Amino acid sequence: PALVRSLKLQKRAARVGFDWPNILQVLEKIEEETKELVEAKELESQEKINEEFGDLVFSIVNLGRHLGVDSEEALKQTNRKFINRFKFVEDTIRSQGGKIENTTLEEMETLWQKAKNS
């Protein structure tokens, strides 16, 4: 998987000293990459958007490495959490006789927060 490859590349670079010395600098890099992604979106260049999105994900994996987080496992956990919460939203709407496609974003967000807090 690409997340695992990113981590390996970063570890290899870090072994020879090509690494940010602290978390603050990693966060600054993430902020920089986020701004570049927004700029690419404004240009409406899908190629540039893809490039900047990849740079942002790579930087986030680097943050995970600095924090001792396994990015692959963290994302798997987040996927499971999303599945459970979204299922709660769907099930709640159905139990109230509604259809999710007729539910407003605001109503779904309210249910999402309820799922998140339970």
Which residues fall in each region the model found?
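Flexible "arm" and connector segments at domain edges
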Residues: P1-F53, V57-S118
